Curated annotation (Swiss-Prot):
UniProt-annotated binding residues for [4Fe-4S] cluster 1: C40, C45, C51, S280
Note accompanying the cofactor annotation: Binds 2 [4Fe-4S] clusters per subunit. One cluster is coordinated with 3 cysteines and an exchangeable S-adenosyl-L-methionine.
Catalytic activity: [[Fe-S] cluster scaffold protein carrying a second [4Fe-4S](2+) cluster] + N(6)-octanoyl-L-lysyl-[protein] + 2 oxidized [2Fe-2S]-[ferredoxin] + 2 S-adenosyl-L-methionine + 4 H(+) = [[Fe-S] cluster scaffold protein] + N(6)-[(R)-dihydrolipoyl]-L-lysyl-[protein] + 4 Fe(3+) + 2 hydrogen sulfide + 2 5'-deoxyadenosine + 2 L-methionine + 2 reduced [2Fe-2S]-[ferredoxin]
Keywords carried by this UniProt record: 4Fe-4S, Cytoplasm, Iron, Iron-sulfur, Metal-binding, S-adenosyl-L-methionine, Transferase
Statement: the UniProt record of this protein carries the keyword Nucleus: no
Name recorded for this polypeptide: Lipoyl synthase
Primary residence: cytoplasm
HAMAP family with a match to the protein in the record: Lipoyl_synth (MF_00206)
Listed InterPro entries: Aldolase_TIM, Elp3/MiaA/NifB-like_rSAM, LIAS_N, Lipoyl_synth, rSAM
Gene giving rise to this polypeptide: lipA
Pathway: Protein modification; protein lipoylation via endogenous pathway; protein N(6)-(lipoyl)lysine from octanoyl-[acyl-carrier-protein]
Length: 298
């Protein structure tokens, strides 16, 4: 691999203006004071300043800040996780109150060290947020929890408003990009979630720029629709550090627009696509759109 391949210069459309107003600063202080983590920070999301400073939203990351997996695209720390914090659900719920969120996303590191994959704490966090914030919609973004059906059922029984689980990349590249997760296991996870709670929208995300072809992407879209996934997000992969997978291609906004049209033509109720789109980007709009489409179909 050449240096030119490894360090491609970012195009103009990926350059963002940072906005660190008092909302951003205040949210950061609150997260630290409550010993909470956000995927916005841990995964180095390019939209953190827009979401925190302008939209005043955030994605909480529970079950600690250390992941048991080491996916080659992800900036989250890996290693031996800490013990579970059983007070975390209430702290998340209190923070949602303080932030005045209308929609909250709750994600987590993979906890392969736990028999339930963290499902019990995940479910309790959903219930705690619901108790304190009855008018806030709740989106969950779990790992595959080892592919154990009972773990998924525990989470779905908590009745989140939307279930998000990312396949991350296309089938052909999956083993190289996320070796300890399985493409078909993720599809099965999404299918089972819909079978357990048919009225809860399901969602997944694909990163672009890892070497996939247009045919690969269309196959992935078809796979998701075959498993009744409602919402799709498409965004540009950005290399977090030298040790992570390199960017093979930067997709221009026009190509994202084309892919969005293809996705919608395949029956997704909503598709968010763009260079800076991430799984939780404009998540409140996605869940509202999906619910409206579901209501229309009845």
């Amino acid at each position: 691999m050449t240096k030119q391949t490894e360090y491609k210069r970012k195009p103009e459309w990926l350059k963002i203006k940072l906005n660190t107003n008092e909302n951003y600063t205040g949210l950061k202080k609150m997260m630290r004071s409550k010993n909470l983590h956000t995927v916005c920070e841990e995964a180095k999301c390019p939209n953190i300043h827009e979401c925190w400073a302008v939209r005043k939203t955030a994605t909480f990351m529970i079950l600690g800040a250390v992941c048991t997996r080491a996916c080659r695209f992800c900036a989250v720390k890996t290693g031996l996780p800490t013990e579970l914090d059983l007070q975390e659900p209430e702290r998340v719920a209190d923070s949602v109150v303080q932030m005045g969120l209308k929609h909250v996303v709750i994600t987590a590191v993979a906890r392969d060290d736990l028999k339930d994959g963290g499902a019990a704490v995940f479910a309790e966090t959903v219930r705690a947020v619901r108790r304190e914030n009855p008018f806030t919609s709740i989106e969950v973004l779990p790992s595959d929890m080892g592919g154990v059906e009972e773990n998924l059922k525990m989470l779905m029984d908590a009745k989140p408003d939307i279930l998000n689980h990312n396949i991350e990349t296309v089938r052909r590249l999956s083993n190289r990009v996320r070796a300890r997760a399985k493409y078909d296991r993720s599809l099965e996870f999404l299918r089972r979630a819909k079978e357990m709670q048919p009225d809860i929208p399901t969602k997944s995300s694909i990163m672009l720029g890892l070497g996939e072809t247009r045919e690969d992407l269309i196959e992935a879209m078809d796979d998701l629709r075959a498993n009744n996934v409602d919402i799709l997000t498409l965004g540009q992969y950005l290399q977090p550090s030298k040790k992570h997978l390199p960017v093979i291609k930067y997709y221009p906004p026009a190509e994202f627009a084309e892919l969005k049209e293809i996705a919608l033509s395949k029956g997704f109720s909503h598709c968010e696509a763009g260079p800076l789109v991430r799984s939780s980007y404009h998540a409140d709009e996605q869940v509202r759109s999906a619910k409206e489409k579901t209501a229309e179909a009845k």
